[in-house]
Swiss-Prot record:
CDD domains: CBM35_mannanase-like
Pfam families assigned: CBM_10 (PF02013), CBM_35 (PF16990), Glyco_hydro_26 (PF02156)
Binding site for substrate: W284, W322, Y377
Residues of the GH26 domain: 163-457
Enzyme Commission number: 3.2.1.78
GO biological process, one term: substituted mannan metabolic process
Phylogenetic classification of the source organism: Eukaryota, Fungi, Fungi incertae sedis, Chytridiomycota, Chytridiomycota incertae sedis
Keywords recorded for this protein, A-Z: Glycosidase, Hydrolase, Repeat, Signal
Name listed for the protein in its UniProt record: Mannan endo-1,4-beta-mannosidase C
Domain CBM10: 489-525, 532-569
GO molecular function: carbohydrate binding; mannan endo-1,4-beta-mannosidase activity
Broadest EC class assigned to this enzyme: hydrolase
Entries under PROSITE patterns matching the protein: CBM10, CBM6, GH26
Amino acid sequence: MLTLTLLLYLSFITTVFSKKVIYEAENGKLDGVSKYNELQGYSGTGYVGRFESAGNSVTVTVEVSQTGMYDMSIIYCGNMGQKINSLKINGKNSGDITFPENSSFEELNIGAVYLNSGENTVSLVASWGWIWIDALVVNDTPNVAKDVSPHINPTLVNPKAIPAAKKLYDFLRSNYGKRILSGQVGGAGQAGDEGQEIQRIQKATGKLPAVWNMDFIFESNDCTWRPENPDITEMAINWWKKYQGKGIMAAQWHWNIAGKTGDFAFYKKDTTFSIDNAVTEGTWEYEKIIKDIDRVAGHIKKLQAVNMPLIWRPLHENDGDWFWWGNNPKSCAKLWKILYERMVNYHGLNNLIWLWNGKNDANTPVDYIDIIGVDIYANDHGPQTTAYNTHFDFYGGKKMVVLSENGRIPDIQQCVDQNAWWGYFQTWNSEFILQDSYHTDAQLKEYFTHKTVMNMDELPSFNVNSYEYQSGNNNNNSSNNNNNNNSSECFSIPLGYPCCKGNTVVYTDNDGDWGVENNEWCGIGNSSSAVVCWSEALGYPCCVSSSDVYYTDNDGEWGVENGDWCGII
């Protein structure tokens, strides 16, 4: 992707209107761009363009009387199509800006930016170039700092959310605007993998990230290869039990479809799969996505069976055109609603917190979204304030905004200073966390031990059986864990789980036999009468009388009773 640095050093102020100060681009220092005056509607004596080659730039210096957040806008013409450009303030990345296609010069509000008292360099960094810039407009009076927490929606969009999901959402909401949670993405298809990424963080900082991210990348039906045991769900359950519910798990789904060459793929260039057809009932594409959703839902049911909430990020980065579900706002919003309806209302998955990571426009399914995610891979540790404000303001301050993916961790102190309250950051795996070119040990220690950052050791347990939403109170120190420990003593008590009243085994590990009661794991004492009912962990009952096998998969043999699947034991 062509990256053009448009370093705007405008040498002087040309016009002052009320509180708005206009900096004419054509009066700046130009490098590789030219002045033009053919288009109508520009201010001053012209405009600059077209930013065709790397290194092209126009430079402006903005001077303000006091440090603070200043509203800024750019007057541009985008008659060469929609372009995405980035903004730099004093050499630090502040975020990406989408310039919609238009036919004449318009003023685009890009939100508030942090400026120091005195001179500041403002840089417009174009990812795509090919745009006309007329002027930069800055308010000469700083804004009052935003109070981000009071207006966040107090409840999840799913009214049937399980107590564990409610508690997690309340915890995130009560800390929003006060703390930033640390996060890390594991290897592809991994869940809670304490591999090289976690080892690097722990060695450099002595901390474990609060949020861990997994990927259902290999769980579509078209995948012809999957990792060997343990599977992703088993890994997640082991992680949940190891930390006794004190971690936060997030997940995306690189949704693989049959590719052009007979393999599977999620990139648009590698498949002919049509999202428009996929959201149209009666098509084979529609039937295909329903089967895929059902398969992934089966995995998430296992997480719900152990009372694990999940921050769920399907259809991620849908504002781009690289994935087959991307750059099609209407159909993508429709697919999102299909996912929600199928998972929540059909499969009864009430452990999900729905994170939207994509395009913000009139099509955005706002009523089906809990949290907003932004993915940013910057070439420095800037706070990405403009990107934060753009997303926060679009939702009227009612939804938390997080860095659902980042390359470099933003400078935490700058985030605090500039009121860029990312709910959490979540660094991508491999070189992004392992190589010093992205993060040195000193930087990792600085960020993970910053007083604003919350790591795993500060989390409460989210494994609860009952919970009511709080009115913005910080529940950081509250347990709310209503496990029934009055049952007869068994191996699970020291692990933080109650004893089962019954004897139906749904899972066995080195600790012993586990059952599920009241949507929570419980330990089964040694009993020769234990009944192994593996299907309950998948959300299906055991067969009572039927022994006819209708279907066999990796989980076991399935029968049918009362019009529903049941597990044969």
